[in-house]
Curated annotation (Swiss-Prot):
Gene: ileS
Residues bound to L-isoleucyl-5'-AMP: 561
Protein name listed in UniProt: Isoleucine--tRNA ligase
Domain of life of the native organism: Bacteria
UniProt keyword annotations, A-Z: Aminoacyl-tRNA synthetase, ATP-binding, Cytoplasm, Ligase, Metal-binding, Nucleotide-binding, Protein biosynthesis, Zinc
């Protein structure tokens, strides 16, 4: 028996079947950075229209987690896909470097400033620590395949950036948005500092829920409002609170002007309660019998006075819209120093802003004898005892509720009135302007707009001052007596900024006031407050986007972060940009959800369900992680588990195998020498290129809409359905058995080449390492890297007016699917082992029969059978099976003739040529003749 193996065009490629990504990717990275790939891309894209994604800076503390990976991979996909779409899309990664978490870490290492180290030395240690953390995170981000200017990232602790943060504050002051006041702010007693809204998390906490009597000072006057005479018993207004420790700071009781209040008589006393809440109060207090003596509107009780249960002063009734009927008594204990609503109401009525609590959360001396020096949360029980002793406690129970906690310490926080600096929301119209700007931004998903609008509508003034060591100084001078800002504040801040640009933030603490103020220094003091870290990152649209030459003075096109950043970075950036520029800092805002495990649970070290991106990369490779991110609908929760990653690895293999098939069958193909003109190609080959053209249009559109999971689905459909289960199956015969330089084979290779050129570009934004690998195996002259390219422009398709147009091949796909069902059953019944052992008869109506017959003898190649006959639908016998195509029945039988050992087809003409006695006539033509001709498939 002769060996005809060397007459076949067997596939061959250096592109391995196994990705072995964990080992191969690090070597690719070395080449990328040796070649300075990021700069290569910048040079290639120079002069193109810019697309700017501004990186929200991660905090420079700790290793990156799976959420960081999601965020950075999504950004990288956008950057790379925009490059493919013809944009110059630079990426400047950044880090948030100041703030409390780093201070706490450094305190653990060297102690608090002032103990063994000066504040200046402490800041230097903080800077050093942040730098070390950045290097660790940077290494992991690079390992993910994220391309960016890693040699020149932006850091909020860069001297120039620190100076520009100070300049941003000066512009806010110049535009009239800065406000100073003793307002209640979120205060962490562990941090001993105010917290921003974004630094507050909510956890369940059990608190005492109490109803407290405030006895009427003038019961006669009170009862008159209810239209009744004063009874003999005491009359009290009942308030409800879950923070007994705030009662020493009570200065009023708030009612709603329009609510109906009732004077209710119970055994031994009369109570004033909101009419709608009387029953619930009585029920929880265990009171079964009561009589309503009278009623009046809340407004009728305004400014009537009630005795504080134990502080020895009176509390007036004030009216506030924040009073609700959701719970409680309809009367709200009001402590202007311990709550924003209380503060606003207190301002309206001129109430004292009492703050009896120190920075450590303990009562100040002189508050109340048994409370002085006690921590507020421990004081709750003492306050309850005092209330009981004074017969003021109507009812006590425990309530589990959501309570604000410090994001760092996870401990409950308090509202505490302290002198602070604020960006005012209403002093100069910032709230109104911000709400207007929100409307001009595209929010993805769309619900983001309503969310941030609600936040802006309801947010208090932004407290931007902090009493910390490691942060950008506010750089302000205030008058010793009036506490007014220096009249030359803007000019002075610029002088400070110039010094900070040279020496960093330490320049402010080293500065002697006289150096800038001269004789004025005697009347002014330096403010040592630092800026909220959210001010640092929120001003990077000015300190980074406006300043870096790569961005060419353009505003950011998109901000992309987790959905928690509506109240964080998106908010602070919007506030600062609107305050200094009068416009939003972004055109689009895209948010992604948080990572959860396969059961939808939040990632937690205590549960043990965390997945480390480093472990995934070491085991599976970064491209699997990237494909998982791209495959997920990131607008909701993003599930990850070993099983989910395994599915991503399976999907990866299908894409890799498609790429490998293309490359292996381009062996010996030079696009410059061997490409076939479209009009000379087999129709099926042109159809396949047209499929790629349609897929590319869909994929490019989805990339543009940031719809990456649909990109992956479309790519998988193309690889698995249009190519894998149809086209690539069909062409194997022609590719392997036709003469190597025949038109039939070169037509096929031309199609494969165009498809590979397109596919590698679709892959590049997501499967960056694999795309680079494919790119280096593709034949022909090309740029060094796929990342400098644009969507492939060499695709073409079938004309709609052609007989064998896309609709024709869609029908053929359907017919082949029905034939496959019959052959699968025959295989299951052990009638055949391979479809080439089969002959099929297709009984079709005239319209379908004409289509099938138009392919002539090449129909068998489309169906992967050795023989096929097309017959009239009405002639079908009982052996023919009705298909799901109404006009088609299919009959199966074993193929006639013998098996050709070269092409494996069964044919009657095997052995008719003596010199090649084992071959079919077609193979003889391909081996010893001019080669077969293929017009269609």
């Amino acid at each position: 028996m002769s060996d005809y193996k060397n007459t076949l065009n067997l596939p061959e490629t250096g592109f391995p079947m196994r990705g072995d990504l964990a080992k191969r990717e690090p070597n690719m990275l070395k080449r990328w950075y040796k070649d300075e790939l990021y700069q290569v891309i910048r040079k290639a894209k120079a002069g193109k229209k810019t697309f700017i994604l501004h990186d929200g800076p991660p905090y420079a503390n700790g290793s990156i987690h799976i959420g960081h990976s999601v965020n950075k991979i999504l950004k990288d996909i956008i950057i790379k896909s925009k490059g493919m779409a013809g944009y110059d899309s630079p990426y400047i990664p950044g880090w948030d470097c100041h703030g409390l978490p780093i201070e706490l870490k450094v305190e653990q290492i060297i102690g608090k400033p002032g103990e063994k180290f000066s504040a200046a030395e402490f800041r230097a240690e903080c800077r050093k620590y942040a730098k070390e953390q950045i290097e660790g995170q940077k290494k992991d981000f690079i390992r993910l395949g994220i391309l960016g200017d890693w040699e020149r990232p932006y850091l909020t602790m860069d001297f120039k950036t620190e100076a520009d943060i100070i300049r941003a504050l000066s512009r806010i002051i110049a535009n009239g948005h800065l406000l100073k006041g003793a307002k209640p702010v979120h205060w962490c007693t562990d941090c001993r500092s105010s917290l921003a809204e974004a630094e507050v998390e909510y956890y369940d906490k059990t608190s005492p829920s109490i109803d407290v009597r405030f006895n009427a000072v003038d019961a006669v006057a009170v009862c008159e409002k209810f239209g009744v005479q004063a009874p003999e018993q005491p009359v009290s207004l009942v308030i409800w609170t879950t923070t007994p420790w705030t009662l020493p700071a009570n200065r009023a009781i708030a009612l709603h002007a329009e609510f109906n209040y009732q004077l209710v008589q119970i055994e031994g006393e009369c109570l004033i309660l909101a009419a709608d809440l009387v029953e619930s109060v009585m029920q929880r207090a265990g009171i079964t019998s009561w009589t309503v003596l009278g009623h009046c509107a809340g407004s009728a009780l305004e400014l009537l006075r009630f005795k504080h249960p134990f502080m020895g002063f009176d509390s007036p009734v004030v009216l506030g819209d924040h009073v609700t009927l959701d719970a409680g008594t309809g009367a709200v204990h009001t402590a202007p120093g311990h709550g924003p609503d209380d503060f606003v109401l207190g301002q309206k009525y001129g109430l004292e802003v009492a703050n009896p609590v120190g920075p450590n959360g303990c009562y100040l001396p002189g508050t109340y004898p048994s409370l002085d020096g006690m921590f507020v949360f421990k004081a709750n029980d003492v306050v309850l005892n005092i209330l009981s002793e004074n017969n003021a406690l109507l009812h006590l129970e425990k309530l589990q509720h959501s309570y604000p906690c410090c994001w760092r310490h996870k401990t409950p926080i308090i509202f505490r009135a302290t002198p602070q600096w604020f960006v005012s929301m209403d002093q100069n119209g910032l709230r109104k302007q911000s709400l207007q700007e929100i409307k001009g931004v595209q929010w993805i998903p769309g619900w983001g707009q309503a969310r941030i609008e609600a936040m802006v509508e309801n947010r208090p003034d932004w407290c931007i001052s902090r009493q910390r060591t490691w942060g950008t100084p506010m750089s302000l001078f205030v008058h010793k007596e009036t506490e007014e800002l220096h009249p030359r504040t803007i000019e002075l801040m610029e002088e400070v900024a110039k010094r900070v640009e040279v020496d960093g933030i330490q320049a402010w603490w080293d500065l002697e006031p006289a150096e800038l103020l001269g004789d004025d220094a005697a009347n002014y003091v330096k403010i040592f407050d630092t800026l909220d870290v959210w001010f640092d990152s929120g001003s990077t649209h000015a300190s980074v986007v406006d300043a870096r030459p790569e961005f060419q003075g353009n505003a950011a096109d998109i901000y992309l972060e987790g959905s928690d950043q509506h109240r964080g970075w998106f908010m602070s950036s919007l506030m600062i940009s609107t305050a200094i520029k009068g416009k939003a800092p972004y055109r689009q805002v895209l948010t992604h959800g948080f990572t959860v495990d396969g059961q939808g649970r939040k990632m937690s070290k205590s549960i043990g369900n965390t997945i480390s991106p480093q472990d995934v990369m070491d085991k599976l490779g970064a491209d699997i992680l990237r494909l998982w991110v791209a495959s997920t609908d990131y607008t909701g929760e993003i599930a990850v588990s070993d099983e989910i990653l395994k599915r991503s690895a399976d999907a990866y293999r299908r894409i890799r195998n498609t790429a490998r098939f293309l490359l292996a069958n381009l062996n010996g193909f030079d696009p410059e020498q061997h490409s076939v003109k479209p009009e000379e190609m087999a129709v099926l080959d042109r159809w396949a290129v047209g499929c790629a053209q349609a897929a590319q249009a869909d994929i490019a559109k989805c990339y543009d809409k940031y719809d990456f999971h649909t990109v992956v689905q479309r790519m998988m459909q193309f690889c698995s359905v249009e190519m894998g289960s149809f086209y690539l199956d069909i062409i194997k015969d022609r590719q392997y058995t036709a003469k190597s330089d025949s038109l039939a084979r070169r037509s096929c290779q031309t199609a494969l080449y165009h498809i590979a050129e397109a596919l590698v570009r679709w892959m590049a934004p997501i499967l960056s390492f694999t795309a680079d690998e494919v790119w280096n195996e593709l034949p022909g002259k090309r740029a060094q890297y796929v990342f400098t390219e644009e969507w492939y422009g060499g695709l073409f398709g079938l004309a709609a007016g052609e007989l064998m147009n896309d609709a024709f091949w869609a029908d053929l796909l359907a017919v082949r699917g029905e034939v496959n069902k019959v052959l699968e059953q025959a295989r299951a019944d052990k009638h055949i082992r391979s479809s080439l052992e089969a002959a099929v008869t297709l009984y079709a109506d005239n319209e379908l029969a004409d289509k099938l017959n138009s392919l002539g003898d090449e129909l068998r190649f489309v169906l992967l059978t050795s023989q096929v006959v097309v017959a009239d639908y009405e002639q079908a016998g009982e052996d023919a099976q009705q298909s799901e195509i109404g006009s088609l029945k299919i009959a199966f039988r074993k193929a006639d003739g013998e098996k050709c050992p070269r092409c494996w087809h069964y044919a009657k003409d095997v052995g008719l040529v003596a010199e090649h006695a084992e071959l079919c006539g077609r193979c003889v033509t391909n081996v010893a003749g001019n080669g077969e001709e293929r017009k269609f498939a």
